[in-house]
């Protein structure tokens, strides 16, 4: 990818999307951001981006967008992503994550073949389902466990099928559980930090033994840019993590930072329906392109915890 390339980002006011856009703008790239401005949109970063000369904002819903501006790459982040919400309102996840992806693929397909951009689908490790031992590879069967992961798996399949049927160039990036600055406080780290700071206990599903792999949003940004620049087209890349933590270990780390006694730091609640025991991926394919995980979780965690701010959001 050249610095002169034009990148369309969908969902660029969301968590990973805003990290990706900030990096692209810092490197002098032209970015066009398509975003619905949902409840989780970062309004502070929206104002920040609008001051940038190489940035354009299109307030639109990916399900209804009817025109794709000129571009060289589409990076498709836009999605509903909170599992609890998918359990209570699965239809919204199906329409946004599946129909929204289909519509974006159709907009690419309608371009003249010489003008069709690369389509990069940002997926999730959750499409594989859980794994008690070992690691999932890109060839592993997709066995999603909840409406969110099922909708993302369906979207991935659409991307592959549009590639085979219509000849679109595509890549799929499947990152591990992301963390970083200014994530909307519905996910484990920001929600738990926000509650503890306000003198309320965090909420822990079950006994906290469920294991997640943690990857910083900046490392995910590196992964996506690496795939765009060096990846083999029509190929899936896992972006995994060397760090696996039980949920209770994450809560313990947050409590230490905020100096909250563990007996006051969290309360156990009934397990989420369809809870996955462990996620883990083999990312040797991505590492062969030169990518590596560079952020250290415990070194990054304190400023993230201290910076949680619900007033940034829509």
Regions found by a protein language model. Give the residues of each.
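N-terminal Rossmann-like NAD(P)+-binding domain of SDR-like oxidoreductases, especially those catalyzing
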Residues: 1-178
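C-terminal substrate-binding subdomain of Rossmann-fold SDR/epimerase-dehydratase oxidoreductases
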Residues: 18-20, 26, 196-314
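Residue-level signal for the nucleotide or nucleotide-sugar donor/cofactor binding architecture
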Residues: 63, 88, 96-99, 146, ...
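Residues in well-ordered alpha-helical elements
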Residues: 84, 91, 102, 182, ...
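Active-site loop immediately N-terminal to the catalytic Tyr-X3-Lys motif
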Residues: 90, 173, 185-186, 231
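Structural element of the ATP-grasp superfamily
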Residues: 104, 159, 192, 286-287
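A glycine/serine/threonine-rich, flexible loop-to-helix segment
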Residues: 134, 185-195, 254
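Hydrophobic alpha-helix immediately C-terminal to the catalytic Tyr-X-X-X-Lys motif of short-chain
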Residues: 154, 158, 162, 192, ...
């Amino acid at each position: 990818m050249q610095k002169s390339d034009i990148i369309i980002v969908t969902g660029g006011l969301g968590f990973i999307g805003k990290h990706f856009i900030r990096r692209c703008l810092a490197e002098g790239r032209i970015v066009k951001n398509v975003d619905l401005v949902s409840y989780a949109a970062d309004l502070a970063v929206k104002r920040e981006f609008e001051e940038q000369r190489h940035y354009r904002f299109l307030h639109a819903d990916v399900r209804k967008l009817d025109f794709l501006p000129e571009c060289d790459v589409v990076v498709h982040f836009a999605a509903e992503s909170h599992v609890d919400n998918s359990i209570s309102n699965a239809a919204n996840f199906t329409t946004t994550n599946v129909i929204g992806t289909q519509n974006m693929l159709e907009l690419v397909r309608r371009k003249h073949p010489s003008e069709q951009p690369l389509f990069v689908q940002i997926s999730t490790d959750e499409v594989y389902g859980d794994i008690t031992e070992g690691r999932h590879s890109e060839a592993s069967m997709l066995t999603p466990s909840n409406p969110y992961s099922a909708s993302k798996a369906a979207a991935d399949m659409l991307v592959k099928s549009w590639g085979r049927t219509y000849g679109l160039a595509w890549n799929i990036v499947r990152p591990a559980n992301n963390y970083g600055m200014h994530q909307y406080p519905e996910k484990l780290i920001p929600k738990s930090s926000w509650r503890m700071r306000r003198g309320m206990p965090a909420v822990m599903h079950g006994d906290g033994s469920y294991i997640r792999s943690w990857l910083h949003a900046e490392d995910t940004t590196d992964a996506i840019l690496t795939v765009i620049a060096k990846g083999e087209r029509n190929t899936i890349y896992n972006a995994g993590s060397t760090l696996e933590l039980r949920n209770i270990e994450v809560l313990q780390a947050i409590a230490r930072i905020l100096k909250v006694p563990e007996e006051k730091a969290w309360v156990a609640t009934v397990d989420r329906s369809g809870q996955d025991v462990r996620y883990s991926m083999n990312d040797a394919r991505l590492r062969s392109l030169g990518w590596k995980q560079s952020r250290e979780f415990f070194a990054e965690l304190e400023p993230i915890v201290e910076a949680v701010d619900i007033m940034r959001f829509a």
